[in-house]
């Protein structure tokens, strides 16, 4: 007994020492990142700059030391989480009932033949889309028939709700908070509405107008038309507004919080599930992209959803779960191109579990076949399109990765760094952004890392905790999940750290932080049992602190710092209130720098599609005389061209003059406007 106590005391002290060194490491990392990031990431000066702490080496080295002590301490304790049990029992096949397997697959192949020839505005597009949906429904029906699945009775449902009412209440509270955080003041934060959001909105509007009928073709940025369908529904309900576009991300981001809860609940326990969901709900980078009307946020939903369905299917030997996992995996090809990584990772996870688990293939052969069939039924139609335009398949990856298009050699020539040095810097930027480095540009442009200091320390300790349990398949999956995204989504692409491409890592990050919080408290409880009574208070305190730190940063510091603001995007957004009322009865003329293609920004067309928009760069009386006089005219002038607009107002007086300063930086003007009726314009004579 004394030996056991001494072992636990030694382990506890090592864990405490690891935590203390980790705190010191985080302080060192934060102190080292002052000044220009370009200088900070000059890899050949890292060793030289170690002594004055202007490189990441001191902080990272201390974290390694902290990890060693923390890991040595953990070895004196046991992991109290229940083991993951996979249903590996073999169920002999019963006589097969008639299903629609061949029908479902046949419909999918027919649609692929159509997609191979059809154009984006093909009038039969909706018909084939409905047929595709029918093929998926037939597949699900076949699985239900094969497994004799039935809906649970009403009494069973109510009984289940009664048993789990406390858990459901906490989950509902987290989801409500997540939605409110993402929906509050959605049209003005982040400010402003950017061009890519306008592109997504116009893609949805094209569907609403009946111009983009073929969902098995590509739209803007080589994204399948189906990716724009949710925006079409929102625009049909709420019109051409910023709300319509951003609401899709709000819903997707909230659902991703639910999905990470489901996955963590399935493979760990409800406490870790609650914590994971809450941590993801308040993570600034996740909040930001859940409020921005681009579809990058979908990655944080598809990844945990696929993994939840796969693990649920493996634990329960549920063919229906495997079918839905295959459907969601297949749908990834129809969304943001980065979601393909979620699909690949889901398939890889299934393969990994099969290799690690004796008898798995025999027990789950039918489930795996259904999984593959479900993927095939969903993806074959779009593959039909790619077969005729194969240069678009993985086109975004080919353009963005530094491994193609002479990316690494070009950087090597420009910087004088070797390929290994370039990749090291890319990896450092992509990983340190989570705990200590800025997140410049890439649709976020935050001066702070993704995690506040205390949460960053717990995350790093969580990474060590996961390594301690790496032989457990659950921990391996979470560990690889996080780092696969960091490497493939940012390290190997241009402009690291690419915040918009690392969103799939955020659910894994939240799980790692949750594992660290519960794991450290469990170590304390094993060392001194009375601590157990304080653990709920400690967890609640940490959650409240994280919530305050993250939410106050994103909704106050980040907002008043104007880090996301851009005059060009502000121009296209704020002028909508002047341009849109013209409808088809007016024209807009932009007076500005002729070298800047402002009117190519899709936001102009999204908010006011029926208004003719032109440039007016030669401001003379003769030019005004030549203007068509059949419509009202709105002149929009950039601040540097105010004098040109004043000339117009002098030559053609009586119009409506407006000055619009930047919304959150009112000392700077954004634009001036001058509106003339067609009668006023017709009365003008040179």
Language-model features, listed with the residues they occupy:
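Membrane-embedded, hydrophobic transmembrane alpha-helices
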Residues: 1-168, 324, 345, 349-352, ...
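Membrane-interface transmembrane helices that cradle and orient dolichyl/undecaprenyl
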Residues: 144-148, 306-323, 332
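Signature aromatic-anchored transmembrane alpha helix within multi-pass, membrane-resident enzymes
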Residues: 172, 372-376, 517-553
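Transmembrane-lumen/periplasm boundary regions of multi-pass, lipid-linked membrane glycan transferases
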Residues: 189, 193, 199-215, 237, ...
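Hydrophobic/aromatic-rich transmembrane helices and adjacent perimembrane loops
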Residues: 289-290, 341, 453, 457-458, ...
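Aromatic/acidic, Gly/Pro-rich catalytic loop(s) in extracytoplasmic/lumenal soluble domains
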Residues: 620-686
């Amino acid at each position: 007994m004394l030996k056991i106590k001494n072992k636990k005391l030694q382990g506890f002290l090592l864990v405490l020492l690891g935590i203390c060194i980790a705190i010191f490491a985080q302080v060192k990392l934060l102190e080292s990142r002052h000044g220009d990031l370009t200088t900070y990431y000059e890899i050949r000066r890292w060793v030289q700059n170690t002594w004055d702490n202007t490189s990441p080496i001191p902080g990272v080295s201390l974290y390694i030391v902290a990890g060693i002590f923390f890991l040595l301490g953990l070895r004196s304790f046991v992991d109290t989480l229940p083991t993951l049990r996979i249903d590996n029992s073999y169920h002999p096949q019963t006589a097969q009932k008639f299903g629609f397997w061949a029908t479902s697959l046949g419909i999918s192949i027919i649609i692929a033949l159509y997609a191979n020839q059809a154009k984006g505005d093909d009038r039969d597009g909706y018909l084939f889309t409905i047929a595709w949906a029918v093929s998926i429904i037939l597949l699900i029906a076949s699985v239900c028939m094969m497994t004799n699945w039935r809906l649970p009775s009403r009494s069973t449902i109510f009984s289940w709700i009664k048993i789990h009412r406390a858990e459901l209440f906490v989950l509902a509270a987290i989801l409500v908070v997540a939605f409110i955080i993402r929906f509050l003041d959605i049209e003005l934060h982040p400010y402003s509405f950017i061009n890519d959001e306008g592109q997504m909105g116009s893609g949805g509007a094209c569907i609403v107008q009946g111009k983009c009928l073929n969902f098995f073709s590509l739209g803007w940025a080589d994204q399948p038309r189906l990716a724009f369908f949710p925006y079409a529904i929102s625009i049909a309900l709420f019109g051409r507004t910023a709300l319509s576009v951003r609401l899709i991300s709000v819903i997707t981001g909230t659902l991703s919080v639910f999905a990470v809860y489901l996955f963590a609940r399935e493979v760990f326990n409800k406490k870790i599930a609650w914590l994971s969901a809450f941590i993801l709900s308040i993570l600034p980078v996740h909040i930001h992209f859940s409020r921005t009307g681009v579809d990058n946020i979908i990655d944080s939903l598809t990844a945990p959803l696929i993994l939840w369905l796969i693990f649920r299917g493996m634990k329960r030997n549920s063919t229906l779960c495997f079918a839905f996992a295959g459907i969601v995996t297949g749908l990834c090809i129809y969304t943001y191109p980065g979601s393909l990584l979620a699909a690949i990772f889901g398939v890889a996870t299934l393969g990994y579990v099969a290799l690690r688990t004796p008898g798995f293939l025999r027990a789950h052969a039918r489930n795996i076949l259904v999984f593959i069939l479900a993927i095939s039924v969903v993806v074959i139609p779009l593959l039909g399109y790619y077969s005729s335009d194969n240069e678009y398949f993985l086109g975004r990856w080919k353009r963005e990765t530094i491994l193609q298009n002479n990316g690494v050699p070009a950087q090597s020539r420009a910087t004088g760094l070797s390929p290994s040095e370039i990749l090291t810097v890319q990896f450092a930027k992509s990983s340190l952004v989570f705990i200590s480095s800025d997140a410049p540009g890439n649709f976020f442009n935050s001066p702070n890392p993704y995690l506040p200091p205390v949460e960053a320390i717990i995350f790093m300790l969580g990474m060590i905790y996961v390594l301690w349990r790496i032989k457990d398949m659950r921990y391996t999956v979470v560990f690889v999940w996080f780092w696969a995204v960091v490497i493939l989504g940012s390290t190997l692409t241009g402009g690291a750290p690419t915040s918009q491409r690392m969103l799939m890592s955020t659910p894994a990050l939240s799980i790692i932080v949750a594992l660290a919080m519960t794991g450290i408290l469990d170590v304390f409880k094993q060392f001194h049992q009375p601590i157990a009574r304080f653990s709920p208070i400690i967890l609640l305190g940490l959650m409240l602190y994280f919530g305050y730190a993250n939410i106050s940063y994103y909704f106050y510091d980040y907002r008043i710092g104007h880090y996301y603001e851009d005059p060009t995007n502000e121009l296209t957004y704020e002028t909508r209130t002047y341009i849109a009322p013209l409808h088809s009865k007016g024209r807009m003329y932009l007076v500005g720098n002729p070298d800047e293609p402002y009117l190519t920004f899709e936001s102009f067309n999204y908010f006011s599609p029926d208004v003719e928009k032109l440039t007016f760069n030669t401001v003379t009386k003769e030019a005004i005389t030549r203007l068509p006089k059949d419509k009202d005219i709105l002149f929009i002038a950039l601040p540097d061209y105010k004098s040109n607009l004043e000339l117009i107002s002098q030559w053609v007086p009586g119009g409506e003059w407006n000055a619009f300063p930047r919304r959150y930086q009112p000392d700077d003007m954004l634009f001036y406007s001058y509106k003339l009726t067609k009668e006023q314009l017709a009365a003008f004579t040179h």
